A protein has these predicted regions:
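Extended, non-catalytic subsegments within catalytic or DNA/protein-binding/adaptor domains
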Residues: 1-350
Length: 350
């Protein structure tokens, strides 16, 4: 706990890992609780949020503070109107999902500091409802799903047997087959891979939907085509990487020497875009999320049930999972096939 040297009687600062220094409003009643609040803040920072969420909350907090400075609001003032204004500002350039993340971060910061903020108050709820209705009219751009046929085309560029090609091929196939988020892919360690007769089991220690770190298991079957088999690609990468404990997917020096440094989440998109470009495809339409979306959409096209798709993607919400398979659904029993590709009619003989 520190005071602002410029205004020692006005502001008390809480140093937190999740948000950095938090300025408490000038309320003497709050200061008697600062030690307890600080302890709570440390506990929340160390246990409550996964690393990717931590980064997202920190970014959200920085943007909220910048907005408050511009508009003359207190970041921890508990002002629902100010938060509503912030959400309205975000609606100009951001998605509803991003706005909800920003709101969750601001609410968490208030809770850590012991300041009441009613996120269901009219100024917040009404803006969110309007935001939701507006984006229902203007659909958001979603990641282009990387379908099986396209993935096979991308894998065709890895003709040379190099450490980088082995790593990148395994990264794409494992990312696709596991339906992991990009942050989850690069968070895997060698120790999280278990070989079994059917294929491999990946142990995901923490994820977006498992903030408490209970862990989840993801199964990947061995394929019949070794060139399009995530298990084979992973085994070939581990052959050159070795089984020394540590990050599964690592950076490489020029020439293929191992660095031991974990890839960053952004590397997933870079590998995918590089492969798309080399395959003559529009690399700009793909993102790291295309692997996850591609598994869900490809499985739906192959006739998989929604519950089985959700088991692999680990979605809790049917509505969110359905977003990924709508592309498959629009082709099911589509009438234009009857009009433009009618079934052949046998000509009568004789």
């Amino acid at each position: 706990m520190e005071t602002d040297p410029k205004e020692p009687s006005a502001i008390v600062w809480l140093n937190t890992e999740l948000f950095g220094p938090l300025p408490l409003p000038a309320d003497p009643a709050l200061r008697t609780d600062t030690e307890a609040i600080l302890a709570r803040a440390r506990a929340l920072a160390s246990r409550s949020k996964a690393t990717e969420t931590h980064r997202s909350y920190l970014t959200s907090w920085e943007q909220w503070c910048a907005f408050c400075k511009l508009m003359g609001y207190q970041p921890l003032g508990g002002d629902a109107t100010a938060v509503g204004m912030f959400l309205a500002h975000l609606s100009l350039t951001k998605s509803l999902a991003t706005a909800r993340t920003r709101l969750a971060a601001v609410a968490t910061a208030h809770r850590i500091a012991g300041v009441a903020l009613d996120t269901k108050a009219g100024p917040i709820a009404n803006v969110l409802e309007g935001f939701k209705r507006e984006q229902g009219i203007k659909p958001l751009k979603q990641a282009t799903p990387l379908l099986v046929e396209v993935l096979k085309r991308l894998l065709g560029i890895y003709t040379k047997d190099t450490p980088a090609n082995r790593r990148d091929k395994a990264l794409l196939l494992i990312g696709f087959a596991s339906a992991l988020r990009r942050s989850e892919i690069v968070a895997l360690d060698v120790e999280d891979v278990e070989s079994v007769p059917q294929g491999v089991v990946l142990r995901l220690l923490r994820s977006k939907t498992d903030q408490q770190g209970k862990g989840e298991l993801i199964a990947i079957h061995r394929g019949t085509d070794s060139e399009f088999c995530a298990v084979t690609a992973l085994e070939r990468w581990i052959e050159v990487r070795g089984r020394k404990p540590g990050p599964l997917f690592t950076r490489l020096h020029k020439g293929g020497r191992m660095t031991g440094e974990r890839l960053r989440p952004q590397a997933v998109a870079l590998v995918l875009k590089r492969a798309a470009l080399a395959s003559g495809l529009n690399s700009g339409s793909f993102s790291g999320h295309s692997l996850r979306a591609g598994l869900a959409t490809s499985a739906a096209l192959a006739g998989a049930d929604l519950k089985d798709i959700m088991a692999q993607t680990r979605h809790r919400s049917h509505d969110i999972a359905l977003r990924y398979i709508r592309r498959a659904e629009i082709w099911k029993d589509n009438v234009t096939k009857l009009l433009f590709s009618p079934p052949a009619i046998d000509e009568p003989h004789g």
